[in-house]
C-alpha cells in the first residue's frame, strides 16, 4: 500500500521502534512492531502519514535546518511539517481520512503518546505539544488554546509549502522560547 501511495519504489521495513518514520534521504519507510497489536486503521495511519513525508518532505533543509536553532527546534519542525503533510495526504487520498482518524483514536486509547502513564492532562502540555496532538487527534480530546495560541494553530494549519513550514516553525519556536519555559521536550 505504501509503495502505491508514494508512487515510487520506497523500501518498507518493520522494526522494533517506538513509532513509524520515513528516511527522506534513503527512501525507507519504517513501521513499528508495537507491544500491542494495532488495528488496520493504525497501520493505515502510519503508512499514510509516512507516505506524506515521502511525497512532500524535502531532503534538503529537513536535517540542515536543525543545527543552528538548538535541539528542540527539530521537534517543532516535525510537528509543523506533520500537520502540513497530513493535510496534503488527506486531500490526495480522501479515503485515508477516516482511517487516520480511527488510527489516532486507537493511539490515544492505547496511551501511545504517554500522557496517562506520566499522569499528565493534555492541557498542561506546552503549546507545541498541544498543537501536535490537536492536529493529529482533532477536537475529541478537549485540547484548549488561548486566543493568542489559536492564532498559532491557524498558522500551522495554513502551511502549504516546506518554506511555509520553516517560516512558521521559526516564529513559533521563538514565541515559545519567549513565553514558555520548555522548548526542548516536545513529543513527536
Regions found by a protein language model. Name each.
Residues 1-188:
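Short, functionally important secondary-structure microenvironments
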